[in-house]
């Protein structure tokens, strides 16, 4: 029952500030029984029984929500203790909360005042905790807490940094997202696949094994010689900088100790180049046992026994290890309960695991995985740390622990290892710490150190009961898990310092006790001590109130450790302990007994047996009892009792850092090994690690970090064991280097060892570096490396040349000094300031004339900048930045095009491959560019998609264009000599519009058979049931199949402002409205930033009902035509929070299909109305409607012009920056204005910004002379005719004209059709048919 109540109250506290409803409370109870495997009917009678018990639990509050929908809550004044009296309506409104302090302690492990978590972040933490089983994503979190998404993001980061929550990667709706869960429930979460932020679990290297592997790798190579880098790859230390440095340190160690030799070898291909190699000398002899060879890459530790220990250690301790004073008997809680650690004291479980680990200790990760069944729980890890580090919160049974840092060099994280007192004493003796030091330290150890004492029941009762205990002022956490540290700050000045241990009851016969106390000295300690006193034989026993059988049952885990190899080493050190064993001077015989006081009723039987035959002692080092000290014993005798005081004084507890002692012993041993002096260097740290392994082969090899070494050294200096000297020496390269030396405290400056070390340090490093031997005529194997991974970035030629020139140029020291003086000269600075404030314009002009290719200033990278900002080009037009990459001093788009045209035109007549271009002739088009820059630029752009079509078009059509131009006398014939050839006029001629005429129709290709029609022209039959409008952006369909599907589709005009009234009341036009709304949205999205008008966009969109607009937006999003833009600035501007998708933009880039040209007549009507109504943004609205050819027609006739100066359309009808939101400046950022000649002819129009009236006749197709557009359109006309004749035999010429190309003039269409008939492809006889012979050819 108590477990259930505690479980429910814990779950209520975990719900935090969101609270817990009554239904949820019974879910917790049902979950508790289910996990335990207990069948319990949660009916109303049982709930009535449990309800008041839960409400009486400390820190549980009952709140009620208001009846209105505001959701406000208030604390209930009259608590309904009888569950049956609560109505169903009232149950829905009642919420259970834990008190604020308990909420904060449960979720953040700290009180609200001590925690650094903000209250708003705590709200998020409460919400995440509420969904602790299933997880919650960020969007849901924002909705529930009603906080801004940006703020939530930062607070989640803060909670994650505090290791309170964890992100869990999941796949939701085909996209990877993250759920947020409490860190402690990470493994219990039902949606977990892989945590996003995994803890570093990289391997820790076994250095001995690595050194052995390096030697084996070099030995296995040919001739025993291997490249330095190849050996590194063979031992798999090639992944990170740390691994490479680690490998280099080990190679240096092997070289210094004579296992390998560093040498150089000539490369066979280039004899002047040497490479570093390693030569094998002798196999490596490891100082570790052979049993450790298998454990070089263990994840947590290098000790094989730890894995076995984890398997043997049950989740819960056995029943015998509990005491009757513990609140809940074990029978109620089975070992299968996964959430056990939340409702039982962690420290109890920790102790059992640590005690059974013995000498090796247990690492934090093993404690957590062994006890809680979770991977790595940082909050619990912090709890363990606080139990050890904060003296005020250490329970009695944990005060014997100490921590050591365990290195994980891969991620620089800290893991902590926990030890029992017994294993620490064993370590200290093995490490050679003097017995005097140990005896001085032992009195400071807590009185209950060494074994587990029974649980103090006050730890787990409510704090109300605990407040009655006035002798302890430490707070107990509400969940009864641990004692909390006192508040920070300076402690109050008082003589009586309270201790957190359970109060000791005074005894009646306290004054009659003999003067003896058993200290927690380990068996090995006394065992070594008894060797020097073989004659002494005594039997000491202290009988407590517990029987020996119970004692042996509780402490059966302790077994004596035998360390025979240390017996002889510590004979002398053990002599200090002789007085300990001679304390029986006041005892009449060898056997004596001492009765323990009543207040030690929890004590255990401890026996000390010393005999001649066995040098073994069975000592239960559980407690030493603080009793009064005999006056005869003094500190000078070396007794362990000397510093003990009476229990009435309550001496302050001192923590003993055994690890610090170990480190001090290690450094002093190294000092002795180095003859009393050594230098602090990288080698010293490696030697310390090796010495540590030599002293105790069972430990893992870890390198001490500098901070730890510094702290230990400072302690040794305070104790006047060592001195630290600093020497500044010249390293031989003209630089002073600091060297730190550690010497024995009593070493004199004239000591030979000090002089020797000083001479060694002051030797310049250049002299120390012995040049490695160069091996000649030796074959070395080269490992094949993955070139793709190791390929370096090629340096641009300009930078390379600049580097070379700067290296070769000698540095003039005087000139450098002069420049520095000029920089610092105040008059010079003032003059520069004046010049910058008032520049001379005439001077500026002269400098521009002298250096036309001067380096311009750096350009601000602004994608949507207006054209005026692009002032770094020679022409006023700017180039797009997306298609061809341009730098600030690079070619413009016009220069690129001119270069391609000049090269092709020169090549066609004068020949020459790409390598043998007549660059002298091409350079005449670019007087300011050198040939080297032209060749580089040509090589970089000739393969670009933009210019491939241009090169192909010129190579196919230039001969004919050239002949026509020469016959019209527009061009002179090519000169015989290439030296006289200037390609400039020829390049200009190639840019002119070039019309297809009957003269060159013979060269065009007609389809030869039906396969040619379907394959070459990619004709597909479109199924009738397909929704054609949805397929307009389907890239898989060919031009002809789209044309066939769309040739009868009406042209839809965007709704104007005047149409609003006409459409009102028309209920049947919803589909048309949806289509128009989509067109309007697309046209608004296409408006560029420069001409965007929020008011205009809003007016256009407000014509449609809200549901139509939402549906239109959703349909455009579903069809991937537009996508959302996540930007704070554009949220309130209609049209700015969307952009065209890449798929849509790329569909616009395709060549103009014929079906778009069929709408010219309808577009002409629309254009006419638009110009008459003086509509703004006309071009933006129509540019995506497939009417680009019609606008080009008007432009070609000179009726219109575009307002951006020199803006042009490329071969596809769109500019190269089509991928961006606006399809970029050249394409859509334009408005149509009257051309110059039109405005002059109109007398009424004085301003050229007025819109032009369209021409009276229908627009005809204008063919741009650039690239392959002419050929593409010609092929489309051919293809369309063949396809229509196959589809509709006998169609009349007029029908075909209207069906296909109403935008063409009759003369132009008849010319194409006449050629078609003349070529024998069609017959005209009462209608048009495909020629029978031609049809026969096709089939």
Curated annotation (Swiss-Prot):
A Pfam family this chain is assigned to: B-block_TFIIIC
DNA-binding region: 485-497
Assembly mode: Component of the TFIIIC complex including sfc1, sfc3, sfc4, sfc6 and sfc7. The subunits are organized in two globular domains, tauA and tauB, connected by a proteolysis-sensitive and flexible linker. Interacts with sfc1, sfc4 and sfc6.
Composition skew (Basic and acidic residues), residue ranges: 798-826
Organism name: Schizosaccharomyces pombe (strain 972 / ATCC 24843) (Fission yeast)
Location of Phosphoserine modifications: 595-596
Keyword tags: DNA-binding, Nucleus, Phosphoprotein, Transcription, Transcription regulation
Described function: TFIIIC mediates tRNA and 5S RNA gene activation by binding to intragenic promoter elements. Upstream of the transcription start site, TFIIIC assembles the initiation complex TFIIIB-TFIIIC-tDNA, which is sufficient for RNA polymerase III recruitment and function. Part of the tauB domain of TFIIIC that binds boxB DNA promoter sites of tRNA and similar genes. Cooperates with sfc6 in DNA binding. Localizes to chromatin insulator sequence without recruiting RNA polymerase III and plays a role in nuclear organization.
GO BP of this protein: 5S class rRNA transcription by RNA polymerase III; transcription initiation at RNA polymerase III promoter
Cellular compartments annotated: Nucleus envelope
Name the UniProt record assigns to this protein: Transcription factor tau subunit sfc3
Region span, Disordered: 470-515, 791-826
Compositionally skewed regions (Polar residues) per UniProt: 495-514
GO cellular component: nuclear envelope; nucleus; transcription factor TFIIIC complex
Classification via InterPro entries: Sfc3/Tfc3_C, Tfc3-like, TFIIIC_Bblock-bd
Superkingdom of origin: Eukaryota
GO MF term list: DNA binding; RNA polymerase III general transcription initiation factor activity
């Amino acid at each position: 029952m108590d477990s259930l109540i505690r479980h429910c109250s814990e779950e209520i506290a975990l719900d935090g500030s969101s609270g817990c409803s009554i239904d949820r409370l019974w879910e917790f109870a049902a979950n508790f029984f289910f996990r335990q495997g207990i069948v319990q009917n949660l009916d109303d009678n049982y709930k009535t029984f449990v309800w008041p018990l839960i409400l009486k639990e400390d820190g549980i509050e009952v709140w009620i929500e208001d009846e209105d929908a505001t959701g406000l809550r208030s604390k209930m004044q009259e608590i309904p203790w009888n569950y049956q009296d609560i109505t169903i309506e009232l149950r829905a409104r009642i919420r259970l909360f834990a008190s604020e302090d308990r909420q904060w302690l449960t979720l953040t492990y700290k009180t609200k005042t001590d925690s650094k978590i903000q209250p708003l972040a705590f709200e998020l933490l409460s919400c995440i905790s509420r969904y602790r089983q299933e997880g919650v994503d960020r969007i849901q979190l924002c909705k529930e807490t009603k906080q801004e998404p940006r703020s939530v993001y930062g607070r989640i980061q803060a909670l994650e940094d505090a290791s309170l929550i964890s992100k869990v990667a999941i796949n939701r709706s085909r996209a990877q997202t993250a759920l947020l869960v409490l860190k402690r429930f990470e493994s219990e979460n039902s949606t977990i696949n892989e945590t996003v932020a995994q803890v570093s679990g990289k391997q820790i290297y076994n250095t001995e094994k690595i050194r052995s592997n390096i030697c084996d790798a070099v030995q296995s190579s040919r001739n025993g010689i291997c490249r330095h880098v190849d050996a590194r790859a063979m031992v798999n230390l090639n992944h990170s900088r740390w691994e490479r440095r680690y490998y280099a340190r080990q190679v240096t160690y092997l070289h210094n100790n004579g296992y390998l030799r560093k040498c150089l070898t000539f490369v066979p291909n280039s004899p002047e180049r040497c490479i570093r190699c390693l030569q094998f000398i002798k196999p490596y002899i490891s100082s570790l046992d052979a049993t450790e060879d298998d454990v070089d890459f263990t994840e947590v530790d290098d000790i094989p026994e730890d894995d076995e220990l984890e398997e043997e250690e049950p989740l819960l301790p056995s029943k015998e290890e509990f005491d009757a004073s513990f609140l809940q008997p074990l029978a109620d809680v089975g070992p299968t309960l996964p959430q056990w650690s939340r409702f039982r004291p962690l420290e109890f479980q920790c102790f059992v695991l640590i005690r059974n680990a013995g000498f090796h200790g247990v690492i934090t990760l093993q404690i957590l995985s062994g006890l809680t069944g979770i991977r790595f729980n940082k909050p619990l890890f912090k709890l363990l740390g606080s139990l050890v580090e904060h003296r005020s919160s250490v329970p009695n049974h944990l005060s014997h622990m100490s921590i050591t840092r365990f290195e994980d060099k891969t991620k620089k994280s800290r893991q902590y290892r926990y030890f029992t007192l017994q294993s620490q004493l064993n370590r200290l003796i093995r490490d050679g710490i003097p017995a005097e030091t140990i005896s001085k330290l032992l009195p400071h150890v807590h009185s209950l150190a060494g074994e587990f004492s029974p649980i103090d029941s006050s730890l787990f009762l409510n704090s109300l009961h605990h407040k009655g205990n006035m002798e302890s002022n430490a707070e107990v956490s509400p969940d009864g898990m641990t004692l909390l540290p006192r508040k920070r700050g300076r402690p109050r000045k008082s003589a009586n310092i309270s201790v957190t241990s359970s109060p000791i009851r005074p005894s009646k016969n306290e004054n009659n006790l003999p003067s003896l106390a058993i200290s927690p000295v380990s068996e090995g300690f006394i065992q070594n001590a008894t060797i020097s006193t073989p004659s002494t034989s005594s039997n000491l026993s202290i009988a407590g109130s517990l029987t020996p059988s119970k004692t042996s049952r509780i402490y059966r885990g302790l077994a004596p450790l035998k360390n025979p190899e240390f017996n002889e080493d510590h004979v002398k050190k053990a002599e200090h302990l002789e007085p300990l064993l001679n304390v029986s001077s006041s005892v009449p015989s060898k056997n004596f007994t001492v009765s323990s006081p009543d207040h030690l009723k929890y004590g255990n039987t401890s026996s000390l047996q010393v005999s001649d035959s066995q040098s073994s002692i069975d000592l239960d080092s559980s407690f030493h009892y603080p009793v009064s000290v005999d006056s005869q014993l003094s500190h000078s005798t070396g007794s362990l009792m000397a510093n003990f005081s009476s229990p009435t004084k309550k001496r302050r507890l001192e923590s003993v850092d055994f690890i610090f002692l170990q480190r001090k012993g290690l450094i002093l041993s190294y000092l002795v090994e180095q003859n009393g002096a050594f230098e602090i260097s990288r080698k010293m740290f490696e030697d310390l690690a090796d010495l540590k392994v030599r002293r105790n082969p069972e430990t893992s090899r870890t390198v001490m970090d500098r901070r730890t070494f510094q702290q230990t050294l400072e302690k040794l200096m305070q104790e006047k064991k060592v001195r630290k000297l600093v020497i500044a020496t010249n390293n031989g390269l003209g630089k002073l280097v600091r060297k730190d030396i550690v010497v024995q405290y009593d070493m004199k400056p004239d000591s030979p060892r000090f002089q020797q070390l000083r001479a060694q340090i002051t030797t310049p490093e250049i002299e120390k570096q012995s040049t490695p031997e160069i091996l000649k005529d030796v074959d070395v194997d080269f490992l094949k490396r993955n070139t793709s991974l190791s390929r370096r970035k090629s340096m641009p030629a300009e930078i390379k040349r600049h580097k070379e020139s700067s290296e070769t140029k000698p540095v003039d020291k005087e000139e450098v000094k002069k420049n520095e003086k000029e920089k610092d000269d105040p008059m010079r600075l003032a003059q520069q300031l004046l010049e910058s404030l008032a520049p001379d314009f005439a001077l500026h002009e002269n400098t521009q004339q002298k250096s036309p290719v001067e380096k311009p200033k750096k350009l601000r990278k602004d994608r949507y900048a207006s054209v005026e900002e692009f002032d770094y080009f020679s022409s006023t037009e700017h180039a797009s930045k997306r298609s061809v990459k341009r730098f600030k001093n690079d070619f413009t788009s016009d220069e690129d095009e001119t270069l391609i045209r000049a090269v092709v035109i020169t090549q066609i007549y004068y020949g020459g491959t790409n390598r043998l271009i007549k660059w002298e002739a091409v350079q005449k088009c670019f007087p300011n560019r050198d040939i080297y820059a032209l060749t580089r630029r040509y090589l970089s752009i000739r393969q670009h998609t933009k210019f491939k079509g241009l090169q192909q078009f010129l190579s196919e059509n230039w001969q004919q264009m050239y002949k026509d131009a020469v016959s019209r006398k527009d061009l002179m014939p090519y000169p015989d000599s290439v030296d006289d050839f200037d390609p400039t006029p020829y390049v200009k001629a190639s840019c002119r519009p070039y019309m297809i005429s009957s003269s060159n129709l013979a060269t065009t290709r007609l389809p030869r058979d039906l396969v040619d029609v379907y394959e070459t022209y990619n004709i597909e039959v479109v199924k009738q049931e397909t929704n054609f409008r949805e397929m307009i952006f389907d890239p898989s369909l060919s031009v002809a199949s789209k044309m066939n599907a769309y040739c009868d589709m009406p042209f839809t005009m965007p709704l104007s402002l005047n149409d609003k009234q006409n459409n009102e009341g028309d209920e049947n036009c919803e589909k048309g409205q949806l289509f128009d709304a989509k067109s309007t949205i697309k046209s608004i999205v296409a408006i560029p930033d420069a001409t965007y008008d929020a008011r205009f966009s809003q007016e256009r969109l407000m014509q449609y009902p809200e549901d139509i607009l939402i549906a239109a937006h959703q349909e455009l999003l579903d069809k991937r035509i537009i996508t959302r833009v996540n930007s704070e600035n554009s949220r309130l501007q209609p049209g700015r929070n969307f952009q065209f998708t890449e798929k849509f933009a790329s569909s616009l880039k395709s060549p103009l299909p014929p079906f778009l040209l069929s709408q010219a007549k309808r577009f002409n009507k629309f254009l006419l109305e638009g110009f008459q109504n003086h509509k703004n943004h006309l071009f933006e609205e129509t540019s995506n409607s497939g009417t680009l050819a019609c606008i080009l027609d008007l432009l070609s006739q000179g009726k219109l012009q575009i307002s951006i100066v020199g803006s042009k359309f490329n071969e596809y009808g769109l500019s190269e920056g089509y991928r961006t939101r606006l399809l970029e400046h050249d394409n859509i950022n334009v408005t149509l204005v009257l051309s110059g000649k039109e405005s002059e002819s109109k007398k009424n129009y004085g301003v050229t910004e007025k819109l032009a009236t369209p021409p009276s006749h229908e627009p005809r197709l204008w063919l741009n002379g650039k690239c392959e557009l002419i050929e593409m359109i010609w092929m489309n006309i051919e293809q369309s005719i063949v396809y229509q004749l196959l589809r509709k035999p006998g169609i009349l010429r007029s029908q075909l004209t209207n069906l296909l190309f109403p935008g063409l003039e009759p003369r132009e269409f008849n010319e194409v059709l006449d050629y078609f008939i003349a070529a024998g492809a069609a017959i005209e006889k009462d209608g048009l048919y495909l020629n029978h012979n031609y049809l026969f050819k096709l089939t």
